[in-house]
Amino acid sequence: MASGGGGGNTGAGGGPGMGLSLGLGLGLSLGMSEATSEAEEEAATAEAVGRLATTLWLRLRGWEAVLAAAQRLLVWEKPLHSLVTAAALNGLFWLLSSSSLRPFFLLSVSLLAYFLLDLWQPRFLPDVSASSPEEPHSDSEGAGSGARPHLLSVPELCRYLAESWLTFQIHLQELLQYKRQNPAQFCVRVCSGCAVLAVLGHYVPGIMISYIVLLSILLWPLVVYHELIQRMYTRLEPLLMQLDYSMKAEANALHHKHDKRKRQGKNAPPGGDEPLAETESESEAELAGFSPVVDVKKTALALAITDSELSDEEASILESGGFSVSRATTPQLTDVSEDLDQQSLPSEPEETLSRDLGEGEEGELAPPEDLLGRPQALSRQALDSEEEEEDVAAKETLLRLSSPLHFVNTHFNGAGSPPDGVKCSPGGPVETLSPETVSGGLTALPGTLSPPLCLVGSDPAPSPSILPPVPQDSPQPLPAPEEEEALTTEDFELLDQGELEQLNAELGLEPETPPKPPDAPPLGPDIHSLVQSDQEAQAVAEP
């Protein structure tokens, strides 16, 4: 019992799987059968087209020259011949339409002409075809037929005729099948079509309809062969687009005017309409005067140029960083050392000043702590031995100055103010730029002035640029860039030759000391000698 129940459950469980597999199998078989049936139909259609084309080719292979000439006339390859043929056909048509002959007589005459041509064709038109009927699409046949490459050969024409005939037969079979399946609908549609033709024949004569059909047959090959419709559309497209845009603009203007009148009608008091019209015209004239005409191309070009330009702040930052900046271009990196070695031009004062400030800052922020611990007694023979080198360096440095008034910033790190009313600049160590350097520079180039580090306190109020004295060992923090600019403009004072000599006399210095370039700190034993001389000057200046 249990085993039987288990077998029953197994059969019940396998039922849905079996049904699904059967359904899938049936669907696949139906799909495959439909695909095979479509393939068979296509193969049968192609075979039927081939048979019919071969039959037509066998009948028309003797008329290849006539068919080629007819194609040339229909496509107007020779306009004069085509024009004469069209005039002859029109005259023949109107002659037959105006005659009292019956249509059956015309039909019989047409059939008689056909049979006579078929009978006399071998005598007047010899057979020039040499290919077999199994190969109606060979190239040798088209060449022998006399047809041009852009015209249809007889095999191609036969194939097109066969396809058209089979398509007509298929539509006719579908129509008959529709008649058998839906007789009522078929009757209604046929009756409506006949009624339309009756109305058309009542208003338009039959002879005119026939003439329109004849003209269509004569002119349609010309239109298709030369693509007249496409050429006409290509030439008329700009005019149509312009007309469309103008109509849209006029419609938008009318719509805007209508909405404006509605708003004015709602807001205006219940008075006459004439003042409203005058106000509207005046407002429109004013608005037209305040609305300029914007050229789209010029606006886009202006925006593109504005976006590519750099602001003044960006240009100054890039120039100070060693970049060659030009408007509406990308910055190009240049060699900073070459810019520093070249002579500064008068047209670039800001660049020269910023470079000098940077050099002064580097020299003043590095106090020679290792030199301060060394012995202070140094010989002056080393200074005498290097006088010639220092003179050459001083002359080269003074020649590189951009203007007669070359300022050196001296307000970064101060070492205390000396007594006797003499205020020293809060610069670094005094040996960086000593008064001997200033006096030597003045003797070397009288037209060039460099301010000394210590200024005579002639002003009653202390200058805000003077910082409180700090110890020599502790470095002074750097001020902000804004404070640097303000202090740079306020710390300098021009002194004449008499004040400089008085200052040298108070410090007890000799004016014959060789000059030292202001923008480069002294090297070697000169530093120790200058330190010793500065200490002696401070000892003499103390009370």
UniProtKB/Swiss-Prot annotation:
Motif (LIR motif): 490-495
Pfam families tied to this protein: RHD_RETREG1-3
Membrane topology type: Multi-pass membrane protein
Subcellular location(s) of the protein: Endoplasmic reticulum membrane
Transmembrane segments: 12-32, 100-120, 204-224
Ranges of Pro residues composition bias in the record: 461-480, 512-524
Region (Disordered): 254-287, 336-394, 411-486, 504-543
Record field: compositional bias (Basic residues): 254-265
Modified residues (Phosphothreonine): T279, T334
UniProt biased composition (Acidic residues): 275-285
GO cellular component terms attached to this protein's record: endoplasmic reticulum membrane; membrane
UniProt free text on domains: The LIR motif interacts with ATG8 family proteins.
Described function: Endoplasmic reticulum (ER)-anchored autophagy regulator which exists in an inactive state under basal conditions but is activated following cellular stress. When activated, induces ER fragmentation and mediates ER delivery into lysosomes through sequestration into autophagosomes via interaction with ATG8 family proteins. Required for collagen quality control in a LIR motif-independent manner.
Protein name: Reticulophagy regulator 2
Protein species of origin: Homo sapiens (Human)
Name of the encoding gene: RETREG2
